[in-house]
Each structure stands twice: as C-alpha cells, then as structure tokens.
A protein has these predicted regions:
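Coiled-coil termination/hinge junctions
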Residues: 186-193
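Charge-rich, well-structured scaffold segments of protease-associated domains
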Residues: 1-184
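Long, His/Glu/Asp-enriched segments that create or flank divalent metal/ion-associated functional microenvironments
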Residues: 194-211
Length: 211
C-alpha cells in the first residue's frame, strides 16, 4: 500500500504491538499497553510523529473487506505459530492460570486469542458491526493523553524537538469522558488438552514459587 511504501522509504520501520509489564508492588498486578515503535533518522522526526498520529486516529476501522483480510491473515499466522512452537504454546497456556501477566499474554497471542480470531472470521457477517463498534470505542479508551508514555534512545541532537512533537501528538488524542473497563484475571487450575495435526505431544505444568 501507499502508506507501507511511504513508511519504508522514510524510516527504518514503524510497528504496533501489545505489551504487558508486571507490577512488582502489587501481587499479580500488571500494566497492559499498546505500543508504537519507530526507527528513524533525526531529520525524519516530524514525519514519524505525523504518521503515528495518522495511524492511531485515522485508520478506517469501518473498511469491512480489509478487516476480514486482517482476520484471515491473523488466523493463518497463529495456526502456524502455535503449532510450530508447541512447547511455548503449552507453557504459556499453563502459566496463564497462575500469573496475571501470562494470563494477559495468552489472551493476546495464545490459544484464547486464536479462538477469538477464528470465531470472528467464521461469523464475520453476523459480528462485523459489533466488532467495528468495539474497535472504535477501544481507540477512544486507549489513545488518550493520560495513557501516553514516551521512550527515546538518542543523543542530545535526537532529543531536540521531541518535546514539541509529543505535545502536538497529545493535543490530538481523545479526551472525551468514557466509562473504562479493566482486565480481570482469576487464578485457576485446569487439566486440558488440545489436538493438532502434529506428531509431537507437549505436556506442561506450571506453578508459582512465591506460593
């Protein structure tokens, strides 16, 4: 796409991901964040912040055909990743029952996430409107000034002008009042199995040393 070529011709890449950080002061506490990472030459700083703002605030979530393509692509990637790394899949699933951080990671990259994507893709016609509404609400909950954290690796020259760009970005983020939700993790003990086409079986047991 035009955006893809523009990003790659002017930067070293811009990527988005979900990240989870543990909270050492609170047992089973964690901080979940949507991160945008960019690599760029100092001369491209303004361009990078402009593109980040464009991606976060002007993405066409109502483009149903593209939304379905993304779901299908995610499903295929997950099918391959979860099967090829069966040992990691099993370990992550087991840990999700004893750790809030692992529980969140499992929901955004593990079997739970795969099941969600599979369900949305299989019943896209029935669920597309609800999905779009939820995505539109999520961007207004996530992309807010109070949620913004900036981390930069650069020398003095690279840091100059950063404050100005961050201020401009904060000014266009969402500020309307919305009811917020939260991630609720419940410790559990399950004995379960998952069948794949693979010939190798993986068994995982997890526990918390502090307990």
């Amino acid at each position: 796409s035009q955006l893809f070529h523009e990003i790659n011709s002017c930067t070293g890449g811009i990527s988005c991901a979900l990240q989870v950080f543990s909270n050492e002061k609170k047992e089973n506490g964690c901080v979940c964040m949507f991160s945008v990472q960019a690599k760029y030459l100092y001369s491209q700083q303004s361009f990078v912040f402009k593109i980040i703002s464009e991606i976060l605030l002007n993405s066409r979530l109502e483009a149903k055909k593209r939304l379905y393509e993304i779901l299908s692509s995610q499903k295929m990637q997950l099918q391959s990743a979860l099967t090829v790394s069966g040992h990691m899949t099993a370990a992550q699933r087991a840990l999700s029952y004893v750790s809030a951080v692992s529980g969140w990671q499992e929901r955004i990259s593990g079997i739970s996430y795969y099941r969600l994507i599979e369900d949305l893709e299989s019943h896209f016609d029935e669920k597309k409107e609800a999905l779009i509404c939820k995505l539109q609400r999520l961007i207004k909950l996530i992309f807010r000034p109070e949620n913004l954290t900036v981390s930069l690796t650069a020398d003095g020259q690279g840091c100059s002008g950063l404050e100005k760009e961050v201020k401009k970005l904060k000014e266009v983020l969402y500020t309307e009042s919305l009811q917020k939700g939260n991630f609720r993790w419940i410790a559990d003990q399950k004995n379960e199995g998952f069948k794949t086409s693979g010939q190798v079986q993986y068994v995982a047991v997890a526990g918390a040393f502090r307990k």
